[in-house]
Each structure stands twice: as structure tokens, then as C-alpha cells.
């Protein structure tokens, strides 16, 4: 079944590969990315490979208004959330910046989704939430033990 999927951080490494597969599966895709740790060229190549177009909005998840407008205009069936800061060492040096982007930005996304009754989200997390004491393979039911603000 064809869906409209809103992808935050879609120009990044993981996000662009997900967009590639979504387009191959014939979904409509809108990417919302500030291009801080990514580049538009990745999306252009995804379009070349699939011979399909995706929509792109240059924006930051910290900007609740712009994010809300993009989601309202697109009215997605689902959201795939890859936007965020990801360097563990930097998160220790700049914890408030990481909180602002990763927590507040995610809250902005959830608020925007709520306004258009979009209830499906896939969130890309990290194995670092399980800490250093756990050995792979990790399972979602394992207790978390984060060692950094990330």
C-alpha cells in the first residue's frame, strides 16, 4: 500500500538509504533536513537511482513553526525520524545543545504529527542507550544505562 512518509534527517547516511528503499517501494517521500551533517547531493543521487522524485524541505526540527507547516502541508501517513545530533563526545561537551535538538526537536515533531492525526513513527535510536555493560545482540526489552547526554 502506497504511503506518504515524512523523513526527518533524510539527507544523512541512514536517512538517504531509507529514502532510497521507500521510493523503490513506490511511497511518496518528503525529506525535512537542515543539512548540518548531510548534503542534498545524497538525495539527488537517490532520485537518479530510483528515477523518482521526492520532496525536500530545508528546515530544522528545533523550529516548531516551520516543522509544523511542512507536516501540515504534506499530511503524512507515517514519520521516520533520523534528525538529531549523534557524537557522544560532543554531547558531553555540549549537553544542552544535544537536549535542545534531540529532545525538544523530537517533541516538536510529535506535536506537529498530533495536529494532523499522524500516529505512526519510527525513531532511529542508538545502541549507546544500553551502556557499556551490555554485550550485543541488544534487544529493546533490555534495561537502559546511558553513559552520555547523547
What are these language model-derived features?
Residues 1-150:
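N-terminal Rossmann-like NAD(P)+-binding domain of SDR-like oxidoreductases, especially those catalyzing
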Amino acid at each position: 500500500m502506497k504511503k506518504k512518509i515524512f523523513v526527518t534527517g533524510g539527507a544523512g547516511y541512514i536517512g538517504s538509504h531509507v529514502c532510497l528503499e521507500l521510493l523503490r517501494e513506490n511511497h511518496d517521500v518528503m525529506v525535512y533536513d537542515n543539512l548540518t551533517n548531510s548534503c542534498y547531493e545524497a538525495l539527488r543521487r537517490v532520485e537518479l537511482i530510483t528515477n523518482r522524485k521526492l520532496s525536500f524541505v530545508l528546515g530544522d526540527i528545533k523550529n516548531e513553526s516551520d516543522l509544523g507547516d511542512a507536516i501540515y502541508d504534506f499530511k503524512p501517513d507515517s514519520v521516520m525520524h533520523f534528525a538529531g545530533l549523534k557524537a557522544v563526545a560532543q554531547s558531553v561537551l555540549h549537553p544542552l545543545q544535544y537536549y535542545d535538538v534531540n529532545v525538544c526537536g523530537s517533541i516538536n515533531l510529535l506535536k506537529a504529527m498530533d495536529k494532523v492525526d499522524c500516529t505512526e513513527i519510527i525513531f532511529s535510536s542508538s545502541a549507546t542507550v544500553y551502556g557499556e555493560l551490555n554485550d550485543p545482540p541488544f534487544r529493546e526489552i533490555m534495561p537502559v544505562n546511558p553513559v552520555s547526554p547523547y
